[in-house]
Amino acid sequence: MAEELSFQGDGSNRLPPQNIEAEEAILGGILLDPEAIGRVSEVLITEAFYISAHRDIYQAALRLHAQGKPTDLLSVTSWLTDNELLTRIGGRNKLATLVDRTVSAVNIDALAGLVMEKYLRRQLIKAGNEIVHLGYETEKELPIVLDQAEQKVFGVTQERPQSGLVHIADTLINNFQEIEERNQGIALPGIPCGFYDLDAMTSGFQRSDLIIVAGRPSMGKTAFCLNLANNIAATMKLPVAVFSLEMSKEQLVQRLLASEAQIESGYLRSGRLSQTQWEPLSRAISMLSEMPIFIDDTPNITVTQMRSQARRLQAEQGVELGLIVIDYLQLMEGGGDNRVQELSKITRSLKGLARELSVPVIALSQLSRGVEARTNKRPMLSDLRESGCLTGDSLVTLAPGGLQIPIRELVGKSGFAIWALNQATLKLEKAIVSNAFSTGVKPVFTLTTRKGCKIRATANHKFLTIHGWRRLDELSIRQHLCLPRHIPSFDKQTMTYAEVALLGHLIGDGCTLPRHAIQYTTREIDLAENVFFLAKEVFGDAITPRISPERSWYQVYLSATQRLTRNLRNPVAKWLDSLGVFGLRSYEKFVPQELFSQPIELISCFLRHLWSTDGSIKLVGGKKPRPIAYYATSSYRLAVDVQTLLLKLGINATLKLVPQVGKGRNQYHVKITGKPDLDLFIKKVGAVGEYKLNSLQQIFEYLENCIHNTNRDIIPKDVWKKIVVPAMQSVQLTTRELHSNIGTSYCGLALYKANLSRERALKVAEVVQSSELLTLAKSDVYWDEIVSIEYSGEEEVFDLTVPGLHNFIANNIVVHNSIEQDADLVIMLYRDDYYNSDTPDRGLAEVIVAKHRNGPTGTVKLLFDPQFTKFKNLARSGY
């Protein structure tokens, strides 16, 4: 029946601290005196009882009291019976014994304190044992162990239970009591900040909330938060902790003095005060010295250190803290390579701090420079995110099928899967998107890679380099970016081989315009016959195809068998329309979305027949012949689609613009070169038609005797200094020994100037024993050079949030996501007179509530006095 806790550690068999007689006297008093439960319910928790039966009886009394019912013997017996607990506590005899042994409830308050004391001693013993075990966990970093140990001891001092499952009825009772008190004006919903309109909108700062106050420099972020700290400390008499990572405590106190004494800070800094200024200064010093404001100006402080300081302050003051202010977020240390994820981890830790101490935590945050580039410089929620955004036409690769959807069409959706890169394994994995959203109109730049991949993004959007995530405005020409080496395909077949083959021919050389005969044009009779039979296989007797020789061409007309009327369409036109590719001119053509989600065998079939139209497979002559396969089209979208379909087969093709000066529309060539990619093309795509088959055979025979020379699928040379050299030092390997072990002639440091092939990277990784280099050599990524970054104007931009992996594939490039904001309340500051000297809002500051998890958003206006860096209330707006 005793409390189920582990109390080993001192090697004795002593019982844990407890007082059974006091527990029985308390319960007997509750059963005898209807007022007794009200005297102890606020100080005595259920878990304090050592005997489990006593916990059940006390819980029954608490439930009855909360419902306004008496706690006499009959009522408690009835409640225990209804909840099937009577037998477990020892039956009616147990309750009768408690009543018989109790004379009165006169000393119940003292007894409750005694039982709580024994409970806290037991908790202290439990915490001590757990701390002993923590001391042996040497794999954990010492600051983490110390923080966890401190947290366990701190938990013992708290009056409320620190953890465990709580029945919803208990929480509902507490909520109802709070609502009732607020309705009667007894209690405020949150901690008033002193600004009336802001309090009206937020209902005060709620305990356990993380609040972000953001703005560009000179908007008054620090002044605003110091005003909040001053107001809460002065009016609520609650301790306020200020952690200043940017300014010293002397500078902060000087600001508080200037604001409180109404003396310009310049006079305080110089010490040149007039006779009339000494009295308000003395009065301000007297008032501030009585306020419970505590400042820590340790630079680069961690959340763990803050938590420790805040716990200690709360224990010393003996009351809950009123506010914690952190100035500012970006200066905090998080211990990670990826700054975006590091800041996300910091904000989650701050949210945990707010919940643990039940105190509002305000973190100041610097907004990105993107605000300055806009015409309207009012900040938006998206400015707070560390990551940037993409234009609406950016194609996001979904999982598992590999459909590519414009990001603008995903806005408002969540819970769908995309392909993302696991940075630990450098393999593609499925990840779930939690949010897709627009972030407004912003300046964008077009980034183009050597392969011809293009993406338009804001300057602060991050891309993955060999050195980690880098903003677009930090990238340079010839720097390598991370791209997927292949895109996984779906195994669910929804189209037939005949359908995808016919589709390839019609997209390539078909005329499918409205009010025009559906026809296919080719120079080769075997291709004409192929289309003839494919059409019959797909549509059967519904069409009557015919081949018509015309000069040096063959036309295949795909006519409907039935006479066409207003309500009866050609079956071929109807089918193409259902796929979204009917009525397109050559420069408008693209691959239907449905094809992207087909198995690779069908994708190969489509490409094989498409290549027979405007594709080329040949050996380019000269002193040194070179094999090449390319597809030519005047449609940029079709070229991108073909490049993407090849990527699904593991073929990394390049996309090149081929200008047609004076000859018509520009052409786009999707080129396949290099032995590995051409081998894959021959194996997986192949050819159809006698002409293409002969050319393919020539290339096959050439490649059989060709030595592979890596110049595209490489690992950037930066890894020599980043990974290889440190690994060599750890295994005490010289440069000459490295050359010898990887089987290459000694060339000194010149070796480090060359990119690595995957084969060489595998050898080097084995020699220097580098798991990081081995992961790169076996990865799913392709490192592609940047060839240009150009400004593209302003446009509406969008982004995704991908919890966990924090990235996704857009336009066949690995890009970072926007991390979800953990804050419960986001406040942004804006002063129009800072940007516009002739504004009618001179002297006004806009406090923009951009996010409010439990209430409305909107804008509150305050007076801002720059002379004393002080925010003041306007007349009450009656919000």
Swiss-Prot record:
Q: Which InterPro entries match?
A: AAA+_ATPase (IPR003593), DNA_heli_DnaB-like_N_sf (IPR036185), DNA_helicase_DnaB (IPR007692), DNA_helicase_DnaB-like_C (IPR007694), DNA_helicase_DnaB-like_N (IPR007693), DNA_helicase_N/primase_C (IPR016136), Hint_dom_C (IPR003586), Hint_dom_N (IPR003587)
Describe the PTM: This protein undergoes a protein self splicing that involves a post-translational excision of the intervening region (intein) followed by peptide ligation.
- State a single Pfam family of this protein: LAGLIDADG_3
- Please state every residue range assigned to the domain named DOD-type homing endonuclease: 502-651
Instruction: Outline the extent of the SF4 helicase domain.
Output: 184-451, 614-878
State the Gene Ontology BP annotations: DNA replication, synthesis of primer; intein-mediated protein splicing; intron homing
Residues that, per the record, bind ATP: 215-222
Any single GO molecular-function term of the entry would be: endonuclease activity
Name one cellular component (GO) term: primosome complex
Q: Which residues form the signal peptide?
A: none
Q: Which function does this protein serve?
A: The main replicative DNA helicase, it participates in initiation and elongation during chromosome replication. Travels ahead of the DNA replisome, separating dsDNA into templates for DNA synthesis. A processive ATP-dependent 5'-3' DNA helicase it has DNA-dependent ATPase activity. The intein is an endonuclease.
How is the quaternary structure described? Homohexamer.
Annotated family: Belongs to the helicase family. DnaB subfamily.
Protein name per its UniProtKB record = Replicative DNA helicase DnaB
Supply the source organism for this entry.
Nostoc sp. (strain PCC 7120 / SAG 25.82 / UTEX 2576)
Q: What is the lineage of its organism?
A: Bacteria, Bacillati, Cyanobacteriota, Cyanophyceae, Nostocales
Q: Which gene encodes it?
A: dnaB
